[in-house]
């Protein structure tokens, strides 16, 4: 379970960071 959660976080985090950096 944690492996899948970490994978999802790894995929979502860069998008969130780039979104915050744009604003």
Curated annotation (Swiss-Prot):
Q: Which key words tag this protein in UniProt?
A: Membrane, Secreted, Target cell membrane, Target membrane
Tissue specificity, in the record's words, reads:
Expressed by the venom gland.
Location within or outside the cell: Secreted; Target cell membrane
Q: Can you quote a single GO CC term?
A: other organism cell membrane
Keyword Secreted part of the UniProt annotation: yes
Question: What processes in GO biological process is this protein linked to?
Answer: defense response to other organism
Q: Which InterPro entries does the entry link to? A: Antimicrobial_4
Name the family: Belongs to the non-disulfide-bridged peptide (NDBP) superfamily. Medium-length antimicrobial peptide (group 3) family. Ponericin-W subfamily.
The protein's job, in short, is: Membrane-perturbating peptide with multiple activities. It is insecticidal, since it induces contractile paralysis in insects (L.cuprina) during several hours, and death after 24 hours. It shows antibacterial activity with higher activity against Gram-positive than Gram-negative bacteria. It is also antiparasitic, since it potently inhibits the larval development of the major pathogenic nematode of ruminants (H.contortus, IC(50)=5.1 uM), but fails to reduce the motility of adult males of the other nematode B.malayi.
Full protein name: M-poneritoxin-Nc1a
Q: Which organism is it from?
A: Neoponera commutata (Large hunting ant)
